[in-house]
Amino acid sequence: MENFPTEYFLNTSVRLLEYIRYRDSNYTREERIENLHYAYNKAAHHFAQPRQQQMLKVDPKRLQASLQTIVGMVVYSWAKVSKECMADLSIHYTYTLVLDDSSDDPHPAMLNYFDDLQAGREQAHPWWALVNEHFPNVLRHFGPFCSLNLIRSTMDFFEGCWIEQYNFGGFPGSDDYPQFLRRMNGLGHCVGASLWPKELFDERKNFLEITTAVAQMENWMVWVNDLMSFYKEFDDERDQISLVKNFVTCHEITLDEALEKLTQETLHSSKQMVAVFADKDPQVMDTIECFMHGYVTWHLCDARYRLHEIYKKVKDQDTEDAKKFCKFFEQAANVGAVAPSEWAYPQVAQLANVRAKGDVKEAQKPILSSIELVE
């Protein structure tokens, strides 16, 4: 395995953060912890239900890690929506992360998908059955146009995960395949549309801005994720079907060339995101900017992405990019580094165990143990 291109990664990250004028001021520390715990607590109770436990069949440690990661993403990024909306979105996106980590073949359970859908029957695929049950709780926050985007994008995501089951990075010469798959499993339209709850935005009045935001967010969100995930995925055998690796296969280019391609597209998208909305409705621009800054903070602070390892590696280096990266990292940590023990309690497994005893109050006590570690 070749060495990770640390200097290139530092330069790319710094340019990205400079382009979006990174300065996360979305919350006070108290507000952040309050929102984290509210969203987590509701979502934890949801996944501790017997039906969810029986149908998902997810390892408790993995489910706990997935939930903590997603709650962080939603609370940090969807800073303008209500706590109730944050909680419902956290549940929805946790379902998507659970599916993304699954290795089950969906084919048998999807044979009668449309017939069951048309007849109003419960889906044979357990993931679809549970997601469909929760969807009304999500869609109640949004108007019909945004809701349609959430539904359609979730269906695309399922198809993208299905494709990934084959660990297929594309055929050489199939230049459209990498972006096709990334758009399919990126949830860009779902994310872009879920920024505009009807209690804050009239989707008819802001239709043009919302439509443009969905279009722009589709690429920006997934490309930033791919860049910020590049370090953790670099030598992980489970993450070899990534956009960068698929560029290498399909475009028949080197890894450095593929990373440069992603870098240029991400930076261009970031410039567009800022420029397009600069003179639009201030509330729209504020929502987008808060999302971008919170999304970056989440990546820098969530242990899943291991960017603290980069920070420790380069904090004593004297290069300009190393200094800038460390300054940005410390800036993010000052606002976003919150230990899970301060908000991620009770654990889902504990809730599930005590539910039958009717002693849910006991499970509400903070836990200062394994939840400190997020996969």
UniProtKB/Swiss-Prot annotation:
Keyword Manganese: no
Group of enzyme by EC: lyase
Pfam families (alphabetical): TRI5
Membrane-spanning residues: none
UniProt entry keywords in alphabetical sequence: Lyase
UniProt KW Lyase keyword: yes
Catalytic activity: (2E,6E)-farnesyl diphosphate = trichodiene + diphosphate
GO biological process, one term: sesquiterpenoid biosynthetic process
SUPFAM superfamilies in UniProt: Terpenoid synthases (SSF48576)
Domain of life: Eukaryota
Entry's Gene Ontology molecular function annotations: trichodiene synthase activity
EC number of the protein: 4.2.3.6
Pathway: Sesquiterpene biosynthesis; trichothecene biosynthesis
Function: TS is a member of the terpene cyclase group of enzymes. It catalyzes the isomerization and cyclization of farnesyl pyro-phosphate to form trichodiene, the first cyclic intermediate in the biosynthetic pathway for trichothecenes. It serves to branch trichothecene biosynthesis from the isoprenoid pathway.
Additional notes on this entry: Trichothecenes are sesquiterpenoid toxins that act by inhibiting protein biosynthesis.
Family: Belongs to the trichodiene synthase family.
Name of this chain's protein: Trichodiene synthase
Species in which this protein is naturally found: Fusarium boothii
